[in-house]
Structures are given as C-alpha cells and as structure tokens.
Regions:
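C-terminal domain-boundary segment and adjacent tail
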Residues: 49-50, 64, 180-230
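Solvent-exposed loop/turn segments at secondary-structure junctions
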Residues: 33-37, 61-64, 79-80, 86-90, ...
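Active-site beta->alpha N-cap acidic-glycine motif
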Residues: 19-108, 114-115, 187, 191
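Positively charged n-region of N-terminal signal peptides that target proteins for export
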Residues: 1-4
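Bacterial N-terminal signal peptides
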Residues: 7-15
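Structural detector of well-ordered beta-strand residues that form the stable sheet scaffold
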Residues: 55-57, 81, 119, 141, ...
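Alpha-helical scaffold elements lining the catalytic groove of polysaccharide deacetylases
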Residues: 42, 88-113, 122-168, 181-187
C-alpha cells in the first residue's frame, strides 16, 4: 500500500507544472517617483486584486500633493522608502542638503511609517549619500532589472524586457507615473504569478534570504545564497 501511494504521489508531481511543484523564485517590485494621483490608485487597485505587496520609493513633494494616496500605500501593507524630497541628483548635493531631502520627506509620512531604504534619484550615489544614509540608518536601494519604463511607453516592450531578464531575488525598477507603466506592471505580475513566482517587498525579500541590511550599503538584489561546497 505504501509503495502504491508513493507511486501515485510521484505521478502527481510529474503531472504538475514545474511552477506548481516548486516556486521559480521570489522578486520585489519597486515603484519610483510617486505617489501620483490616478496612476498610483489604479496600481494599488491592481496590486490589491492580485494579493501583491510592493515597495514604493516616494518623493516628498508628491507626498505633499497626494497625502491620501500615501496613506493608502501604507495602510494596504506596502513598503515605503525615500526617493528624496525634490528628486534632485543627490551626487550634486552637500551632506546637509541630502539630509534635508530625507528629513523633509520623513515629516510628511504617515504616523508609524519608518523607512529603511533610500533610493537616490537615478541611482546616483556618492560618498556623501552613503555617509548620510549610514547616519540616518538607511540602506541604499538599487535594482537589478530596469526596463526604463519612464522613457519607453510601450507596455508590451516593457513587459518583454522584464520577463526576459528576471531571475530569482531580483529587484525590479518601475514607475507609477503613466498608464503604460501601470499596465505593464500588472501584466508582469499576471504572467509571473501564473508561472508560480512570488512577490515580496524588498524588506521581506531580504529577510527571506537571511540578509542583514547595513546602513549606507547598497543592495541591488537578493539571490539565493550559494550552498557551501560539500
């Protein structure tokens, strides 16, 4: 009887798609430059319908414009990180001005929201940015997949670039600033979920991989740690 059950179990496993037997991996979706009005709301609707949590790197001046959207991002369980107040290139700023970009944004965040990531606009980092991030106990967030959706407004092209490049542990850079970006993001989710991929916030992805986030250090992805040689 036991041998029969084992044979049945093996047959079932062989009959299942690969994604059903084992998840292809975990990825984190990140959205820069928001919040916006309609676009972010539509994105949040789509994420909610799909049960997906994402990480939003917000600009202070946009939080001031859309405090209700910011509150919704936070209340629906998404992660919030800093993207500066004014979206200036932080490589060109003094340490004092970099700190102000962070502090002025922090003052506008929902009560209880304490970001752990800073993503400098354009990914433009410098020693000064790293020093301020370290002093503010912030890790620097990079990315490993970038379809450049801010300049490429063809939804199918953005989707194809992401799907052709994505690997386990990737951090995907997108924006919630246009219809095409929102549509591409939701299409990407639909395809990857169908294949068995799971979506996490960046902090969740780091924890799953056992990564200790260090202030001032940059993280572009969180792949599965390599097994030690036998």
């Amino acid at each position: 009887m036991r041998r029969f059950l084992a044979a049945v179990a093996a047959a079932v496993c062989l009959a299942l798609p690969a994604s059903a037997a084992q998840s292809p991996g975990y990825v984190a979706l990140t959205f820069d430059d928001g919040p916006s009005g309609r676009f972010t709301r539509e994105l949040l609707d789509g994420l909610y319908d799909r049960g997906v949590k994402a990480t939003f790197l917000l600009c202070g001046y946009r939080i001031r414009q859309y405090p209700d959207v910011t509150q919704r991002i936070y209340e629906e369980g998404h992660e919030i990180g800093f993207h500066g107040y004014s979206h200036k290139n932080m490589k060109n700023l003094s340490r004092r001005d970099i700190a102000s970009e962070i502090l002025d944004t922090e003052a506008l965040l929902p009560a209880g929201c304490h970001p752990v990531f800073l993503r400098p606009p354009g990914g433009c980092c410098s020693d000064s940015v790293r020093q301020v991030a370290q002093a503010r106990e912030l890790a620097i967030l990079g990315w490993s997949v970038d379809p450049r959706d801010w300049e490429n407004h063809d939804t199918a092209s953005v989707e194809k670039k992401v799907l052709s490049q994505v690997h386990d542990g990737d951090i995907i850079l997108l924006h919630d600033m246009s219809d095409s970006s929102v549509a591409a993001a939701l299409e990407i989710i639909d395809v990857l979920q169908e294949e068995g991929w799971e979506f996490l916030t960046v902090s969740e992805l780091a924890r799953r991989r056992g990564a200790e986030l260090r202030p001032g250090r940059q993280y572009d992805k969180f792949p599965e740690p390599e097994s030690p040689p036998q």
